[in-house]
Amino acid sequence: MSMKCFQCQETVKNQGCTVKGVCGKPDNVANLQDVLIYTLKGISFYAHEGRNLGVKDEEVDRFVMDNLFATVTNVNFSEQDFIDRIKQSFKIRDQIKEQVMLKYREKYGENLDNKVPSNATWYTEDELNFKTKGEEVGVHSSDNEDINSLRELLTYGIKGIAAYAHHAYTLNQKDDEIFAFMHKGLAATTDDSLSVDDLVSLVMECGKFGVNTMALLDKANTEAYGHPEPTQINIGVRNNPGILISGHDLKDMQELLEQTEGTGVDVYTHGEMLPANAYPAFKKYDHFVGNYGNAWWQQNEEFEKFNGPILMTTNCLVPPKDSYKDRVYTTGVVGFDGVTHIPEREAGESKDFSQIIEHAKKCAAPEELEQGEIPGGFAHNAVLSVADKVVEAVKNGDIKRFVVMGGCDGRHKSREYYTEFAKALPQDTIILTAGCAKYRYNKLDLGDIGGIPRVLDAGQCNDSYSLVVIAQKLAEAFELEDINDLPVSYNIAWYEQKAVTVLLSLLYLGVKKIYLGPTLPAFVSENVLNVLVDKFDMRPNSNVDEDLEKIMAGE
């Protein structure tokens, strides 16, 4: 069996993984994911047609959203889980198909059949056919390289939207227009009548809905847990057993804190859960100790030393070592064969974390990795509350430039560029960050400017929305019509599909001169890249000295 996956930055030789994913995903799982995406596109064909007929089904919307999320890099490695998801996709497809066919016949007096693509009809009961189908329906679905590139770019952007919409939905925030675009975009990726220009327009529309979805999630998080506050976050440990919670799901964080209170078990965040330390609703828990460790790719060593159980709420999961595999718990859309999965919450109920809590009680306290504190909680509400101070610092020359260094971290040695770039920035610059890219520089002693820390961490990757809001409000304060006229530069590190969504969102907002690295996406063809360069002046990283000179000159 073979595979072809190039959806992440670390793909082999920046061309594609064909034997096994660098992420650890085996070829059989990669092919099952391709089949699931194929059937989801078939579901979205009916859901998109249905909306034109007044047919909506929230169960269908949620199924597509959640299953797209399951295919994001480092979320789910479980062969059996994807087999089950494909089987369920047939049932969901039949459910929406029946509703749409009925309405179509009522309106037009004939069946929809002559318009239906193969992904809306394909069916098999033989699981072996799932695997062979995956090789057939993978990433090269068209003979046109640029069409393929744009279809993949659109699909990955929609995956990121689905991930953010999933988190908002968990907190009872939803937007039907987001679901509608999700279906429209997926259906478009199998429509051979669409031209390159049509797909470019859809990619830009994906950026629009990326902004809308991040705004929705910001609303969900802040209404549920308050606006993040500037916070000194502990990175040391205490002498109690603990649970390490990783991923992005704040609802899981809330329920874990509630259920561990008074048990003698401490809670620590890891990776992208670090920003949870800045939310007012979570600060009231005395057993919420702080953050343990660094970015996702270092988890093999750090999970080993944590000693207690680890709860993976979303990505990024690295295939666990046998030495601690029995301490890994997954939940939500995360999956890995051979580890304990905590089921989804019932309507109106909390998830049951009793098993992981009892496990923690039997474990030793975490081994100390480091001591001290790091700053966090500088989302848009906190920064804009001192906007006058920031504006004054710019006007009097204390702050010469802001550099947005949001995005993802990863294994590649080339990412040391971001550490060196942060160190090399002049003392009159401020770094605005969100996402796990922060771990490349958030523990450096970069000082402050008039009491404003030189690294302002807005939060998780979805909190890139905060950076956009900050830039827009600064443009208003300086009475600028074009956001590109601000002393703000963008040096973005990408890794997976949510970063694609963030990038498309920035492009939709008209942001130009984005530096992107550490490599350009393998799925972007030369012609598509030329469009991005010509229209948005996007460029790859080169080296610290060269990029720094250009960025400080506003180039």
UniProtKB/Swiss-Prot annotation:
First-tier enzyme category under EC: oxidoreductase
GO cellular component: cytoplasm
Function as written in the Swiss-Prot or TrEMBL entry: Catalyzes the reduction of hydroxylamine to form NH(3) and H(2)O.
Record NCBIfam families: hybrid_clust, PRK05290.1
Entry's EC annotation: 1.7.99.1
Record field: transmembrane: none
Example GO BP: response to hydrogen peroxide
Pfam families registered for this protein in UniProt: Prismane
Subcellular localization(s) per the UniProt record: Cytoplasm
Residues at which hybrid [4Fe-2O-2S] cluster binds: H248, E272, C316, C408, C436, C461, E496, K498
Molecular function in Gene Ontology: 4 iron, 4 sulfur cluster binding; hydroxylamine reductase activity; metal ion binding; peroxidase activity
SUPFAM superfamilies assigned: Prismane protein-like
Catalytic activity as recorded in UniProt: A + NH4(+) + H2O = hydroxylamine + AH2 + H(+)
Protein name: Hydroxylamine reductase
Binding sites annotated in the UniProt record for [4Fe-4S] cluster: C5, C8, C17, C23
InterPro entries attached to this UniProt entry: HCP/CODH (IPR004137), Hydroxylam_reduct (IPR010048), Prismane-like_a/b-sand (IPR016099), Prismane-like_sf (IPR011254), Prismane_a-bundle (IPR016100)
Gene name as annotated: hcp
Co-factor(s): [4Fe-4S] cluster; hybrid [4Fe-2O-2S] cluster
Chain positions found as Cysteine persulfide: C408
Entry similarity comment: Belongs to the HCP family.
Cofactor, free-text remark: Binds 1 [4Fe-4S] cluster.
Keywords: 4Fe-4S, Cytoplasm, Iron, Iron-sulfur, Metal-binding, Oxidoreductase
